[in-house]
């Protein structure tokens, strides 16, 4: 098991996104974020620019997928983990251009709770 004292968790996020206890939030320019990726030992990334940057830097990462698919947007260098099947029908009346709002509208969340989204043991094993 990994322990918090063994590593630092850097959370790349926008200023308007929630922060998490025990992490260092970083909201910086593209170059600074790419530098963080380049210097990092391990990476847990969502389907976003981070996994593209990691692939370009030849940094294998764990990438979590919910709305998009690694078949289309992923890189074979990564351990791509696809979300579990939905456990509830999401409210998608406000969806525009793609199935889910990239901002994370809670009404569109297709699970009863966050713990159902991914196989957490698979994610942990991927980071070992």
Regions found by a protein language model. Give the residues of each.
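Donor-binding and catalytic core of enzymes assembling or modifying cell-surface/extracellular glycoconjugates
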Residues: 4-71, 78-81
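Leloir-type glycosyltransferase catalytic cores
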Residues: 77-128
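A conserved mid-protein helix/loop that constitutes part of the nucleotide-sugar donor-binding site
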Residues: 1
């Amino acid at each position: 098991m990994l322990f918090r004292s063994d590593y630092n968790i850097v959370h790349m996020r926008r200023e308007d996104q929630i922060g998490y206890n025990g992490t260092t939030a970083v909201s910086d320019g593209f170059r600074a974020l790419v530098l963080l990726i380049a210097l990092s030992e391990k990476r847990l990334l969502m389907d976003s620019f981070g996994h593209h940057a990691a692939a370009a830097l030849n940094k294998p990462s764990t990438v979590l997928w919910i709305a998009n698919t690694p078949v289309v947007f992923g890189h074979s260098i990564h351990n791509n983990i696809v979300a579990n099947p939905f456990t509830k029908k999401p409210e998608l009346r406000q969806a525009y251009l793609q199935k889910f709002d990239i901002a994370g509208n809670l009404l569109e969340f297709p699970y009863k709770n966050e713990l159902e989204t991914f196989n957490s043991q698979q994610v942990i094993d991927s980071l070992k």
